[in-house]
Amino acid sequence: MRHGQVALAALCTLLFLTFLDNTVVSVGLGSLQTDLQASVVQLQWVIGAYALTFAAIMLACGMIGDELGRKKVMLAGAGVFCAGSVLCALAPNAPVLIAGRAVMGLGAAASEPGTLSVIRHLYTGTRERARAIGVWAAVSGLALALGPVIGGLLVGAWSWRGIFWFNLVFGLAALIAVAVTVPESADPTAARVDIAGTFFGAGALAALMFAIIDAETAGFGSAEVISLLGVAAVLAAAFAAWERRAAHPLLDLRYFRLPRFTGPSIVAFCTYLATFAIFFFTALYLVEVPADSGYQIALVFAPMSVLMIIGSLAAGYWTGRAGPRWPVTAGCAAFAAGLLIACPLITPHPDYVPLALALALAGAGIGITVVPVTAAVLDAVPPQRSGMAASAVNTSREIGAVAGASVLGALVFSRLSATLNSHIAALRVPAGDKATILALKPLIIQVIETGQVNKYLNRYSGQGGLITQVEGAAYSAFGDGLHAAFYLSAALVILAGLLAAVTLGRAPAGPLEDDPVIS
């Protein structure tokens, strides 16, 4: 048992790193934006490239691990993750950084599925296995919670590059720990990798993300965006058709007929999408507008992280006693309430204590949902399909992160552009100055998107009060976009909570080995 606990610790260290990188970079976005002259679209890709590659091949990597050996694939993935971290840490520009993040996502996708599969192999007793899976689920929530705090401390002490050197050091430590403590396991009867399904699914997801992000500059009516949306639709249809007829599908779509499988998968998607609104845009706004340091942002997010951890621990106990239905519903309610309370508090001159407390309430809600959502999906399938189920819910989470990077980003900057006119019109300046400012609107938006506001303010400091008013108008428009993202996120989380209340049973469901869907 002691050896099993040591191996579990090694596996959870690797899991922690792969999930940490969903949020740890968010606090460093303002710093790297200034350093690399990156646009907001490029920042979206810094986040989205990791989530996209993670989500696109996670299920396939799980199948490869089952066939070739889970430990081998995990170690290979950890090595790729470390290589991507080095590429990011040394990146001279935004495109190289985005490429490095994509490489890290590939490594994470190869590493993560095996962590759960090996746990099922190590712990043969039902009770011990359940406890180990509970630890596994809690660690993923812990990583999500601590990301902004760790990122803020690293950025404050060094720079955004410190985040990736941190990844390298702990990635190598996790690789060595897994190599030494985790036994090899494989399934000699495992199905061959569904290459066609992987291609169709990954292609559809990538085309959709490219389309939405490209629409921010080209518009949804542009030929390029329409073509990408068409490609995404065709590939998605091909994926569904292939998976229905494949002998060993990448994702058994029959399970989506079960509300208790589909419901928590949708909740996972919505909560990760909404989490992106907090970690990406709040951190970016605080860096760019009040010009907070990494340490200050870490302090703002610290109460949220603590409440996420407490919520996750409490949810494990609550779910064990009452099932996943009400913990998920309550968690979504707390998450949405935190978003709605925090929204008006995000201003150019924020009151940090109320903002931190509102984000802490949202964090408690996020923490409460993590464990029961995973438990609900695992309860909906027989034990031999738990690996697929866990990978499916994690894929839903990563797709939510991809959607957050693309959809919310498009919303924020379309709203910024739409409201900037009204804010400029409200300025108390001569009509001629207003006309000049309106003519410079594209430049103002570009300055906000590239984090160069202070640079341009200094350049035109001789304009006195006029430039100060322009600054206020620009930041107010940016705030309008951020608020729109928060309101949309809160609405999605509320709908997810209602869905959980309807689809999840009142008590923990047993493994559905006799379910007709599995025939």
Segments (PLM) and residue ranges:
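C-terminal module of multi-pass small-molecule transporters
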Residues: 8-10, 57, 69-78, 94-99, ...
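Generic alpha-helical transmembrane segments of integral inner-membrane proteins
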Residues: 52, 56, 79, 83-87, ...
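Transmembrane core module of solute transporters
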Residues: 7-53, 159, 196, 224-228, ...
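Transmembrane-helix exit segments and adjacent C-terminal regions of multi-pass membrane proteins
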Residues: 1-11, 15, 375, 438-519
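Small-residue-mediated transmembrane helix hinge/kink sites in multi-pass secondary transporters
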Residues: 30, 62-63, 151-152, 209, ...
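Helix-loop junctions at the membrane-solvent interface of multi-pass transporters
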Residues: 61, 83-91, 157-158, 180-184, ...
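Hydrophobic transmembrane-helix bundles of small-molecule transporters
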Residues: 134, 156-268, 274, 292-295, ...
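Transmembrane-helix bundle of Major Facilitator Superfamily
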Residues: 1-180, 315-316, 322-324, 343, ...
